[in-house]
Amino acid sequence: FLYLRDGRIAAEYAPRDLLLLPETDVLGMGLRSPHEGKCLPAPSVLDESPAVLKTAGLSKRIRKEVVFDDVSLSFPEGKVTAITGQNGAGKTTLAQILCGLAKQTRGHILIDGKKARAAVRRREIYYCGNDTSTQFFTASVAEELLLNAKLTEESKGRARHLLKEFGLYEYRDAHPSALSGGQKQRLAIACAVFSGRRILILDEPTSGLDGQNMRLIAERLKSEARSGRTILVITHDRELIESCCDTVVEVGTKPGEVQ
């Protein structure tokens, strides 16, 4: 393994040596942990946090294929929920239905206990997809963050703070397409945070990010949850789940099943 820093090879490790690195060294180098951990249990029905977002008997079929069937879930306020499962299990389909970008076959989605039509969900929920190349519409990073904001000194100050936190301030005048893959991911998440919407759905937000930036995102998601936001994260990222998620929903353990 080669460890690169500032465009140079800073170290070289045999697999065994990498596994033996102290955890403090791994963190200091901004790397992912090479060790397996334990994922969280499924959500507890005893969680007393108020459910902002719910599904009731939600089903989705594509032609004759059952994507999921009769799914009833609760996503509590102030919590980060991981949605996991194999590729093709229906995680992104579920997320797009929740935020009003796709239509369910049967069932209802409720916000604050009331049935919410797709148009309402599109206003209430911010969806950050897994293809960042299709999500940016302006000529600069700063403009992207402020796209739907009322331009005030307060909003511009918040934008500056967020860009600095996400390591993007020096690129504020750059076109989003000029960013690296990881920088685009951070910008997309920054836009979600800046949106002010109280329900965020993030699809693979840390895929391909190094340990340092994964932990940055995890800490920010925990902070947003503490402020009262309801956050859903579609992810295969074990470390992200362990770092910030309160509960786990697993899609596709059996055909059409969500746990």
Q: Model regions: which residues?
A:
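Conserved ABC ATPase signature
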Residues: 175-179, 183
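Catalytic Walker B motif of ABC-type/P-loop ATPase nucleotide-binding domains
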Residues: 200-204
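The feature captures the beta-strand-to-loop junction immediately N-terminal to the Walker
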Residues: 84-86
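Conserved ABC ATPase "signature" region
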Residues: 154-171
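Conserved ABC transporter NBD signature motif
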Residues: 107-121
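ABC ATPase C-loop
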Residues: 192-193
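Conserved beta-strand-loop-alpha-helix hinge in the C-terminal portion
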Residues: 8-31, 252-259
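Helix-to-loop junction immediately C-terminal to a conserved catalytic motif
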Residues: 99
